[in-house]
């Protein structure tokens, strides 16, 4: 079975706080999940990964992608096809009420994880926040041999940069529940962050290549 956990951007404090030369708008900041910037770094590379422990362990992974913000958000919003391009997902399905059911393929001996969420989008100039939170849906009851992540929550933050580049930051609740050992959390978060950002970048590149 494929390893990794995916569930499915942004931990910024105030409008004048910057990442590199990026200023985050007040509108985006107000909608973001985590305000505290004092996070611990798990990986400082092309893909940066970190976390902060509050009510939940909030994890984040970020990277600059060499394509337009329109190309990147188109892939992120294609939720029904997540299982086709995010390696650890075995199911992604959306009902008529826009509730999305996602299942994560876990390695033996661990049970799979799944969650049901709704998405929300905020656009402010050259910034996009695409967030999700857990909901209960009668269309997607809990499944046997699968741990339901009842606190699933996260967000994608996109910033349109110069030269047709997009800064992408994905933030998610790293809580795993069930039978997953606490000592394995940091390794799992690092693998998850690398997978979700690299798979996104590959899919954006593939779609742009197919169009040319």
Explain the meaning of each model-derived region.
Residues 78-123:
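Mid-length scaffold segments of soluble, non-membrane domains
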Residues 72-73, 82, 119, 168-170, ...:
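Hydrophobic pocket/interface hotspot
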Residues 4-14:
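Sec-dependent N-terminal signal peptides
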Residues 203-212:
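Short, highly charged C-terminal tails/helix-capping segments
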Residues 65-67, 104-108, 121-125, 136-138, ...:
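Beta-strand elements of well-folded, non-transmembrane domains
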Residues 141-148, 174-195:
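A short acidic/glycine-rich loop-to-helix N-cap element
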Residues 20-97:
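Hydrophobic ligand-binding cavity/cleft-lining segments
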Residues 88, 114-163:
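Hydrophobic-ligand binding "helix-grip"
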């Amino acid at each position: 079975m494929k390893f990794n956990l995916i569930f499915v951007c942004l931990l910024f404090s105030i409008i004048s706080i910057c990442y590199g030369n990026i200023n985050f708008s007040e509108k985006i900041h107000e909608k973001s999940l985590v305000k505290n910037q004092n996070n611990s770094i798990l990986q400082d590379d092309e893909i940066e990964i970190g976390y902060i422990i509050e009510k939940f362990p909030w994890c984040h992974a970020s990277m600059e992608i060499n394509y337009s913000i329109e190309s990147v958000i188109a892939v992120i919003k294609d939720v029904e096809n997540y299982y086709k391009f995010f390696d650890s997902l075995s199911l992604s399905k959306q009902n008529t009420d826009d509730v999305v059911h996602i299942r994560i393929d876990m390695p033996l001996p661990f049970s799979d994880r799944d969650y049901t969420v709704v998405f929300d989008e905020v656009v402010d100039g050259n910034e996009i926040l695409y967030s999700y939170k857990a909901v209960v849906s009668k269309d997607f009851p809990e499944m046997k041999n699968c741990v339901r992540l009842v606190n699933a929550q996260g967000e994608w933050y996109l910033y349109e940069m110069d030269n047709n580049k997009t800064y992408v930051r994905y933030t998610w609740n790293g809580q795993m529940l069930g039978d997953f050992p606490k000592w394995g959390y940091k390794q799992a978060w690092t693998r998850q962050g690398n997978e979700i950002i690299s798979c996104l970048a590959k899919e954006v590149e593939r779609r742009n290549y197919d169009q040319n």
